[in-house]
């Protein structure tokens, strides 16, 4: 007969195996423990984190992703006593997610979906973990499938937070999309390379980031100036004019740079101007106000919790 004491022993044994470095056994034991107890069990959350940690250390990224999603579902069900505890757990979950998503195929797209597109998690970043904006920014810049649709929303968030948090990655996007300072953007890109090469999670995506960032600079430069000579680009790229023209053609075709055209007769790259409707402007400003209002609400909740603890 299987008793409650046996279940407790299974949890303690799992913890012991984990601390001994036997992550395979710990993972198996925690899998059974998680299925034997209900979510009201006091060790249920610990078991979820323990199973996730074991799979990360085993570098079993498929299993780790499944465990991350189970942990997220539990946290989103909000079994906590206060709203502040829920926000804190979401912040911790995003830190753990970095281990998984920066090693999982298409994981960077899932970072965008979780960190940027899910408002409760974006709120947690703004209030408790603005340093996660670096990892979100790198994910957006290097994502070929989501960059175009996500970049505008990311820049809005960075613009809101730039007075309270900045690093070379967010500063690069600030220079490019808010200040329109291309010289400073180039300087920040060099600093980004140094930062990424020393970042545990980002060092493997340095090449992708460098390439994508240069393309963003090229696209924005052409948009601002609307017209740029191929000869000037050739000098900057250290290419012949013919090589530069082929490079630009491949660039436009591969990355589908909106509105870009080459006038071979005049030797120019011409960028079409896209007008923004009044409706789009209203929607963008409304979204910005909503982000700010939610951030203020969470900061007030944090202040209330701090006051309760002080008393």
Curated annotation (Swiss-Prot):
Residues 100-280 form the PCI domain. It comes from the Eukaryota. Disulfide bonds: none annotated. It is found in: Cytoplasm. GO terms for cellular component: eukaryotic 43S preinitiation complex; eukaryotic 48S preinitiation complex; eukaryotic translation initiation factor 3 complex; eukaryotic translation initiation factor 3 complex, eIF3e; nucleus. SMART domains: PINT (SM00088). The keyword Iron-sulfur does not apply. Keywords: Cytoplasm, Initiation factor, Protein biosynthesis. One of its GO terms (biological process) is formation of cytoplasmic translation initiation complex. The keyword Signal does not apply. One of its GO terms (molecular function) is translation initiation factor activity. InterPro entries: eIF3e (IPR016650), PCI_dom (IPR000717), WH_DNA-bd_sf (IPR036390). Pfam families: PCI. Belongs to the eIF-3 subunit E family. Component of the eukaryotic translation initiation factor 3 (eIF-3) complex, which is involved in protein synthesis of a specialized repertoire of mRNAs and, together with other initiation factors, stimulates binding of mRNA and methionyl-tRNAi to the 40S ribosome. The eIF-3 complex specifically targets and initiates translation of a subset of mRNAs involved in cell proliferation. Component of the eukaryotic translation initiation factor 3 (eIF-3) complex. This is Eukaryotic translation initiation factor 3 subunit E. It comes from Caenorhabditis briggsae. The lineage of its organism: Eukaryota, Metazoa, Ecdysozoa, Nematoda, Chromadorea. The gene is eif-3.E.
């Amino acid at each position: 007969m299987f008793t409650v004491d046996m279940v407790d022993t299974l949890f303690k044994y799992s913890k012991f195996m984990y601390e001994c470095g036997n992550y395979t056994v710990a993972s198996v034991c925690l899998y059974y423990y998680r299925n034997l107890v209900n979510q009201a069990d006091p060790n249920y959350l610990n078991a979820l984190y323990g199973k996730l940690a074991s799979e990360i250390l085993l570098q079993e990224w498929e299993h780790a992703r499944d465990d991350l999603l189970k942990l997220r579902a539990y946290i989103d069900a909000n079994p906590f006593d206060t709203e502040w505890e829920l926000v804190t757990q979401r912040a911790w979950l995003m830190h753990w997610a970095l281990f998984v998503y920066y090693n999982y195929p298409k994981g960077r797209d899932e970072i965008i979906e979780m960190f940027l597109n899910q408002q409760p998690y974006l709120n947690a970043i703004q209030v408790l973990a603005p340093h996660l904006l670096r990892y979100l920014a790198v994910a957006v810049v290097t994502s070929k499938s989501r960059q175009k649709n996500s970049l505008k929303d990311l820049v809005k968030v960075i613009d809101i937070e730039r007075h309270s948090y900045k690093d070379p990655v967010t500063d690069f996007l600030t220079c490019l999309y808010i200040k329109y300072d291309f010289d400073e953007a180039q300087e920040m890109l060099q600093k980004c390379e140094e930062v990424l090469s020393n970042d545990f999670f980002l060092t493997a995506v340095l090449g992708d980031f460098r390439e994508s960032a240069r393309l963003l600079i090229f696209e924005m430069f052409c948009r601002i100036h609307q017209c740029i000579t191929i000869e000037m680009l050739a000098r900057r790229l250290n290419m012949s004019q013919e090589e530069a023209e082929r490079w630009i053609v491949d660039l436009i075709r591969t990355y589908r740079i909106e509105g870009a055209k080459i006038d071979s007769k005049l030797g120019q790259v011409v960028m079409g101007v896209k007008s923004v409707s009044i409706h789009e402007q209203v929607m963008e400003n409304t979204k910005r106000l909503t982000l700010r209002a939610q951030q203020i609400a969470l900061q007030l909740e944090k202040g209330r919790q701090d006051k309760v603890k002080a008393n």
